[in-house]
Amino acid sequence: MLACLPGPGDLSFQLLSHTQMNTGLQKWDTTQKMRTAHYPTPAELDAYAKKVANNPLTIKIFPNSVKVPQRKHVRRTVNGLDTSAQRYSPYPTQAATKAGLLAIVKVPAKSILKDFDGTRARLLPEAIMNPPVAPYATVAPSTLAHPQAQALARQQALQHAQTLAHAPPQTLQHPQGIPPPQALSHPQSLQQPQGLGHPQPMAQTQGLVHPQALAHQGLQHPHNPLLHGGRKMPDSDAPPNVTVSTSTIPLSMAATLQHSQPPDLSSIVHQINQFCQTRAGISTTSVCEGQIANPSPISRSLLINASTRVSTHSVPTPMPSCVVNPMEHTHAATAALPAAGPVNLPTGISRVPTGYPSDLKPVTWNQHQLAHLQQMCSEASGTPAPGLTGKHAAGRELAGPGFVGKAPAYPQELCLAQSFHLKPPLEKPTPSPPVNGMAAPLAYPNGHYFQPLWNNILPTPNSDSSGSQDLAMPFHGGQPTGAPLDCAAAPGAHYRAGTGGGPVASQNSLMQTVDYLSGDFQQACFREQSLAMLSKAHRAPGNRAPDPTESRSLHIQHPGYR
C-alpha cells in the first residue's frame, strides 16, 4: 500500500501567507493550515495497524506530521486499551523527521514491528485486542502438591507406620544370640525429616524389661503424631536422596517406655542409667552403651550430656563383652532420632567427662564406678598378657561398615574404634577437662579434636623422638584407659618396644584417672604403684591440668582420633 501524505508545506499556502503577511492571517488561512496538517484519528490508526498486521509486506511512508498516542497522553484509550504506556500502544512510535521516509517492512508472525530508529512496537491482532472474558486456562501442575493431597498422604503414611509398629516383631530374639539382618528394617528406625525444637532422640526405646521378654513381646505403645508429624517411614522405604539417620540402642532396652506424655530426655537417660546399674553384674557391658549418632544441631550439647550419662558404666577395661559377643554391637536394632544435623558424634565416646553428670549425685556415681572398676579389674587380672592376640584379631574383624578407615591395631580398642567424621558441628561442643594427659583441648574450627600424635612428640631422653610411639591409651567416656588397669600384665606390655617413656606416661594417666574419681577409688589394682606416685593425683579440682614440666604427658592421646 502506497500512502502519500502532504509534505511539510503547500506551495500555494506559502505564497498566500507571504503576500498577506502584513495584514495578518485570515480565518480561512488558519483552517487551510489545519487541513494541511492531517492528524489521523485513533480509529484510523487502529484500522491501519490491523491492516498492516495482516499484510506480510507493507510499504509505508512516515511523514513528520503523523501523530500517534505517546506515553505522555495519560489514560488515553484505543478500543478500551490504555495507551499511556508503550506496552499497550498498538502503534509504533515515530521519530521527528523533517521529511517523509519510505520503508519496506516485513511483518513477522508475532506482529512485532521494528521501527527504523530501533524501537519495536507490538501490533495486537484481533484476538489480543479483544480479549475473551473466559477465565484463565488451567495452569500446568506445579511441584507443590495440594494441601488435601498432602494431608491424605501424611495420614496414609501414619497409618502404615502404625500398622507396622503394632505388628509383633518376629525378628526380635534373645540379645545374646545374633539377630537376623531383617531386624534392621524394623519400624523402630523411622525417619523424621523435619527438626524438632526439643530433642526426641529415643522416642520408642529404652524399656526396662529383661532381654528375654522381647522374644514374645511386640511394641505396644502407640505413636505420637505430634512428635513425628505424618512423615515417618521405615528406613527400608526411604528414597535414595534422603539420608536416614539412626541411633543404635540395644534391643534389651527397646520396649515399654511410658508414652502418656512426651518423654523428656533427662528422664529417659535416668531410666537407662538405672537399667545399667541393675545389669552391672552381667558381663554384657555394651548393652548400656548409648550409641547416639547424628545429633540435632539445636540440642547437640544435650545429646552429648545424654550420651555421657548413658555410658555411665564405661570403665577402663579391654571390654570383654566385645570378644564374647562381637556381633551384638553390629546387629543392634536402630531407634528413632531426629535427622537434622550433619554432625556425627562418635558412638560411645563422649567429649563431656563422665566424672561430672548433671542429674545424678556424685556419691552414687562414684560408688557405681567403683563397683564396675573393681569387677573389670578382677576380670582383666585373669587374662594373661599373651592372650591379647586373640582380642587383637577380634578387633580387626569388628572393623566393619560402621568404622571409618582401617581398624587400629590396639587390643583395647575393640569397642572404642568408633566412626569419626570430620564434619564441622554447628555448635561448639563442651570442652572436656584434660583427663587424657593433654595440656588443654584444642579448639579447632570443626570441634575440640586432639592434635595428631606425630605433631607434638617432644624429644625426651628416653624416647627416640621419631614419631613411632603409638601409645595405646583409648579415650572412652572421658576417662583414659590403658595398660595399668590390666593388673596381671607387665607395666609396658601394651607399648611398642624401643619407647622408653611408656610406663611413666601410663602412670601419669593413671594418676589422673584416680584424680577424676574424686579420691574415692579403692586402690585394688594399683598395689605395685608407690604411695609417692599416688600422692600426685590428689590435687585441687581446679589444678587438674598436668604439670607443664612433665613433657611425657603430652604423648598420651587417643589413637582413634588420628
From Swiss-Prot:
Q: Where is the composition biased (Low complexity)?
A: 155-167, 183-201
- Name-wise, this protein is Protein FAM222B
Q: Where do the record's region annotations for Disordered lie?
A: 155-203, 219-245, 537-562
Q: What family is this protein classified in? A: Belongs to the FAM222 family.
**Gene Ontology terms, cellular component aspect?**
mitochondrion; nucleoplasm
